Amino acid sequence: MLGDGKEGTSTIPGFNQIQFEGFYRFIDQGLIEELSKFPKIEDIDHEIEFQLFVETYQLVEPLIKERDAVYESLTYSSEIYVSAGLIWKTSRNMQEQRIFIGNIPLMNSLGISIVNGIYRIVINQILQSPGIYYQSELDHNGISVYTGTIISDWGGRLELEIDKKARIWARVSRKQKISILVLSSAMGSNLREILENVCYPEIFLSFLTDKEKKKIGSKENAILEFYQQFSCVGGDPIFSESLCKELQKKFFHQRCELGRIGRRNINSRLNLNIPQNNIFLLPRDILAAADHLIGMKFGMGTLDDMNHLKNKRIRSVADLLQDQLGLALARLENVVKGTIGGAIRHKLIPTPQNLVTSTPLTTTYESFFGLHPLSQVLDRTNPLTQIVHGRKLSYLGPGGLTGRTANFRIRDIHPSHYGRICPIDTSEGINVGLIGSLSIHARIGDWGSLESPFYELFCKSKKARIRMLFLSPSQDEYYMIAAGNSLALNRDIQEEQAVPARYRQEFLTIAWEEVHLRSIFPFQYFSIGASLIPFIEHNDANRALMSSNMQRQAVPLSRSEKCIVGTGLERQVALDSGVPAIAEHEGKILSTDTEKIILSGNGNTLSIPLIMYQRSNKNTCMHQKPQVRRGQCIKKGQILADGAATVGGELALGKNILVAYMPWEGYNFEDAVLISECLVYGDIYTSFHIRKYEIQTHVTTQGPERITKEIPHLEGRLLRNLDKNGIVMLGSWVETGDILVGKLTPQMAKESSYAPEDRLLRAILGIQVSTSKETCLKLPIGGRGRVIDVRWVQKKGGSSYNPEIIRVYISQKREIKVGDKVAGRHGNKGIISKILPRQDMPYLQDGRPVDMVFNPLGVPSRMNVGQIFECSLGLAGSLLDRHYRIAPFDERYEQEASRKLVFSELYEASKQTANPWVFEPEYPGKSRIFDGRTGDPFEQPVIIGKPYILKLIHQVDDKIHGRSSGHYALVTQQPLRGRSKQGGQRVGEMEVWALEGFGVAHILQEMLTYKSDHIRARQEVLGTTIIGGTIPKPEDAPESFRLLVRELRSLALELNHFLVSEKNFQINRQEV
């Protein structure tokens, strides 16, 4: 895809590769690794031995399809079978059986798992890499204190520190520290070995007092001293096996297990050659670390940058799934031990099949996917969202940081992120900088490091050979890396010029001959979201960040349209998202319809099902439309059907519409947007949304609940859409309050509520008369639409624990309206403030009314000038019928390259269409336009153009809310907060000042009493509105004031208030 004839070529990797490769690594290596750790299990008398033979494990293909798993709320998983043997030691007999040990959820080719019918994705985590790190801090006297921190594989820390007298201490807790000699002795070294293995023995001898000599005289003494300090135990503990085990479990296992990566890091940092399979901390490591620390004290060696990516590791899907498997097998081990013991006690003959249960493995994975912070519900608003979600990197999660504890330095961009983590794409708010996104070409290496590709240059006798290599953050430190790319100019020119380059975390300008490596692609430093922004180099980084987040919130429209100005990455994103249907074989189309495409090839006939009105978890509509005709011959890889928000296999999130940047009667004040009614009536920004409503039927103590159409006491019009079973019919139009599923719940009535004839039946015949309560599924407010699907899911067993579920899917057609949010691709967002008739909109010199009016003041202060370039180039493209795909940073080829391109295209458009107003030399890019109401031209020329504008998921229908009555908080007795809880309008301190400023005393009193937390007044208001009397004034204080008084009382402060009598102005003191 990239590169030219003389140079090496490179293709953009698959965007789902990171997830999929991680899962493949788990199935290929991690599974066997964990199964082979499963120990041999013996009974108490050592007569029976149970073991697993992992060489012959087997994963079975799932019996259900992915789509069925979603609709039936099942897990798309594979059963795992392993051979197990039971050996009787006395007779040497062995019984071998193939046993089922559990289900492992599978990942599809898009990197997504389906658990309980929900699409889930596991995101990658960044952790501090295990190893040793040297740092220096100033103490309260301003003297540098050097420390060496050893981080274990579990995240436990052991700190070594050196004091003013050059004594070295190991800090075992925040308050306790012990001498390095005691720690080494407790780990098994004697004094002679310690002095032989260090570079500065005289320093170690200098702080060896008689007391210290006694402590390290023997290993037992050292362990006792260490235990005393570590566990803060007083007195004289006695050495025993249990004390050793406790120390092993609490200290050495948590803080001294380095793992494979930790061992490699410590070996390279301390110049050791300890074998890789030695994954625990050794006395030799401690002594080498102490030597380095002494060197630091005397100015030798370099300190570590904790935020450099070489000191971080990526915990991928493979690592997380492997950890869970280890946990599940540990639980299985306990189960097998218990079962063997039970079988022998009851004198039963065990078999491998009877000893093993599949519950530990299956439940461990289900709870991991359901509860783990790094396992998230897949965001499927549009194809871009889906693909970006799997490429997230998080500093949060178990073993990581939290939003509260992370400092500014961790959140900041580090030079080592270059080409690995996108400097732009991160979340806004408390997690800014803690959740990042992978750069396009980045990949995860064998040791959990992030690798980025570069071209290596060999310049000999003017003939340059090029080789591509992937470098980890620790390797590219020592190279001069130029920011050149594959779309470079002629090399003869480039050899003579200076180029920007990066060397050892610094950015320099150097001659071309000194360059060792260069980047391979202009987008190499950015994530997918940022790479879709044209002219990103002209935007402020904060606005680019907002744009890459807002593109993920774009709603797929009913009629999508390709962008006129793009970056060339749109096709790759659409293909890798899996949304379009792609031909897997070449052949001929036999027939197409909305549900399937039938293809004939290689003598076989294939039926390719299409997605029809599928609901995403953000309620957007996923739908595929065929793009091939009957009789057409197609090749492998050709697009058969477009999906949601794709056109011709390219990502199409919004629309190219005619925009003017000008103020209009204050209706675009503060980022508001004025639009034409054409956008409503022409279905330009119309989208479909599918909502799911469900109801469960349980078996109660009074009997089972019934689904029925015969619901007493309800009006017939509410039941008009139900079929004979009591479930809403497909295709029916439903309004708010309509019954979707009729359900009756049996309940026992009180004696007094029976009718006289029912009492007679009970008394004479003993017949129990039951009554039922109506518990129907009703359509909530704002849910009106067309019923497109009804599913009756019956779980196996049919018990009260597995209730039957009825799901009703309703499609809504939403046009754009006042209050909806729209945005461009440069962080320029706004809310629709008014919809004008087309005749009142400003119009161009050729009579076309504009579709949207933006505020020009939103551009200079926010410094997102890229929108102006896109706007003008879009106009030229629409007039010339061209599409542009522009790589960023084109200024490296010549100055003002972007402006020259835009002006030259506008000039050509004005020539070809014979419209001189398109490019007027006095004010290029601007044009004189007319007021639609009067027909007069506006005073100033205005920028007009065709940018790409998206409609976002934040829609007014989901936000607007009113409260008539609802729930109150228990403590303050004030209305709850939020639409989902039927909450009230917040009236805070400043709102009270505003009402006071207008002198509206009665409204203010209503707000603070009847409508809020005055319990008695609230009840009286209801009564008087029904009867029709005057609303009484509230007498005493509202509940939140009484609460304040009680809180003060708990602090021994009594609060009284005085009532002045209106008649004689006498003060009556009353307790509150």
From Swiss-Prot:
Superkingdom of source: Eukaryota
Pfam families assigned to the protein according to its UniProt record, in alphabetical order: RNA_pol_Rpb2_2, RNA_pol_Rpb2_3, RNA_pol_Rpb2_6, RNA_pol_Rpb2_7
UniProt cross-references to InterPro entries, sorted A to Z: DNA-dir_RNA_pol_bsu_ext_1_sf, DNA-dir_RNA_pol_su2, DNA-dir_RNAP_su2_dom, DNA-dir_RNAP_su2_hyb_sf, RNA_pol_bsu_bac, RNA_pol_bsu_CS, RNA_pol_Rpb2_2, RNA_pol_Rpb2_2_sf
GO cellular component: chloroplast; DNA-directed RNA polymerase complex; mitochondrion
Keyword Nucleotide-binding in record: no
Coiled-coil ranges (or none): none
Keyword tRNA-binding: no
Enzyme Commission number(s) of this protein: 2.7.7.6
GO MF terms, alphabetically ordered: DNA binding; DNA-directed RNA polymerase activity; ribonucleoside binding
Complex and partners: In plastids the minimal PEP RNA polymerase catalytic core is composed of four subunits: alpha, beta, beta', and beta''. When a (nuclear-encoded) sigma factor is associated with the core the holoenzyme is formed, which can initiate transcription.
Designated name of the protein: DNA-directed RNA polymerase subunit beta
Organism encoding this protein: Draba nemorosa (Woodland whitlowgrass)
